[in-house]
Amino acid sequence: MPKASVTRQIAREKQKLINFVLDIEKYPEFIPFCIDSKVYERNDHKDEIAIIADLTIGKKPFVDTYKSDVRYNKQDDTIHVTNIGGPLKHLENNWKFIQKDKFTEVRFDVDFEIKNKFLDMIMTKSFQYGLNKIADAFQKRAEKI
């Protein structure tokens, strides 16, 4: 199972960045390999925002859709994502947002495994490259908001 972390410093307010990450419907506009997204459910509670969403990812001929449970904890400004359906055997990623003087530090941790062993082996080899491309895309788009 590939595991990795990326930390970026982005010159934006923490809450703007949190809202940006939670705007899942816009992911296909700027995230590499993200073809489509659909939010099925969004509930705003006192302590958290809970979202159920699909992301369609890939590059032909390998395209698939997975369903995620996304939880934003308002108390500690974290977003926790887990897989609840699709081609992934396991997915867990976490976002942490820390406001600094002139920027927000954003930490993204990801851990996943694909059910198909052949695809998992391919993805593992290009995982860090893909993760950096996605982190770059998030940062570039976030700096425009």
Language model regions located:
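Hydrophobic ligand-binding cavity/cleft-lining segments
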Residues: 1-48, 102
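A short small-residue
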Residues: 1-5, 111-118
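Structural detector for hydrophobic anchor residues on beta-strands
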Residues: 2-6, 51, 66, 91
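Hydrophobic pocket/interface hotspot
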Residues: 17-20, 27, 53, 70, ...
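Short Pro/Gly-enriched beta-strand edge/turn motifs at strand-loop
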Residues: 20-23, 49-53, 75-81
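Amphipathic alpha-helical protein-protein interaction surfaces
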Residues: 23-26, 62, 102, 123, ...
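Hydrophobic-ligand binding "helix-grip"
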Residues: 28-29, 36, 41-43, 56-103, ...
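A conserved amphipathic terminal alpha-helix motif
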Residues: 113-145
